[in-house]
UniProtKB/Swiss-Prot annotation:
<dbReference type="Pfam" id="PF17384">
    <property type="entry name" value="DUF150_C"/>
</dbReference>
<dbReference type="InterPro" id="IPR028998">
    <property type="entry name" value="RimP_C"/>
</dbReference>
<dbReference type="InterPro" id="IPR003728">
    <property type="entry name" value="Ribosome_maturation_RimP"/>
</dbReference>
<keyword id="KW-0690">Ribosome biogenesis</keyword>
<comment type="similarity">
    <text>Belongs to the RimP family.</text>
</comment>
<keyword id="KW-0963">Cytoplasm</keyword>
<protein>
    <recommendedName>
        <fullName>Ribosome maturation factor RimP</fullName>
    </recommendedName>
</protein>
<dbReference type="InterPro" id="IPR035956">
    <property type="entry name" value="RimP_N_sf"/>
</dbReference>
<dbReference type="InterPro" id="IPR028989">
    <property type="entry name" value="RimP_N"/>
</dbReference>
<dbReference type="Pfam" id="PF02576">
    <property type="entry name" value="RimP_N"/>
</dbReference>
<dbReference type="GO" id="GO:0006412">
    <property type="term" value="P:translation"/>
</dbReference>
<dbReference type="GO" id="GO:0005829">
    <property type="term" value="C:cytosol"/>
</dbReference>
<dbReference type="GO" id="GO:0000028">
    <property type="term" value="P:ribosomal small subunit assembly"/>
</dbReference>
<comment type="function">
    <text>Required for maturation of 30S ribosomal subunits.</text>
</comment>
Length: 178
């Protein structure tokens, strides 16, 4: 039996991730003999902490071991298991990514033009998101259709955001766009 593929491992991991209320955000399998690795990225609306990731990692290890004993998986000479969250440099590609980063700054790269905005609420259908941009002293509110979203990555912010921006980011989609 060959080293397991991402498809096979995803089918095993996803039910366990769901039981922890995690979304499987990434899975990378690197086959390199005794230095093989399985890197798993999970996230949730409540942001997993280190203790939760440790428990999840142990359960995945047990799941893989049991599947190997049954002959369903073969990791060969062994592997390293890495479990983490995606991190801030992960592009925002799904509505849940935007929802989880509400209130944070996002860098949007559209047609070679970069703009920075604060993420507001999503509409009920999760097809559009509010973006808040500061133009001198005024706040400008626009909406972005997620289906046509440019590359978007959370910006690290060291200063506390202005109160008016925070309040607008916390308002509902309808309130912000009224």
């Amino acid at each position: 039996m060959a080293f397991p593929t991402t498809e096979i491992l995803s089918a095993l991991i996803e039910p366990l991730a769901a039981s922890h209320k995690f979304d499987l955000e990434g899975l990378k399998v690197t086959k390199a003999g005794p230095k093989s690795a399985v890197a798993i990225k999970v996230d949730s609306d409540s942001r997993p902490d280190l203790d939760q990731l440790e428990v999840f990692s142990q359960e995945i290890g047990e799941l893989f071991d049991a599947a190997e004993q049954r002959g369903e998986l073969n990791f060969g000479a062994g592997y390293t298991l890495e479990v983490s969250t995606p991190g801030v440099d992960n592009p925002l590609t799904l509505p849940r990514h935007w929802r989880r980063n509400r209130g944070r700054l996002v860098a949007l790269d559209q047609d070679g033009r970069k703009r920075v905005a604060r993420i507001g609420a999503l509409n009920d259908a999760e097809t559009h998101v509010v973006l808040i941009e500061r133009n001198k002293k005024l706040l400008e509110v626009t909406t972005l259709e997620l289906a046509h979203s440019p590359r978007a990555v959370v910006e690290i912010e060291f200063a506390k955001p202005a109160q008016d921006e925070t309040a607008l980011a916390e308002s509902t989609f309808d309130e912000a766009t009224a």
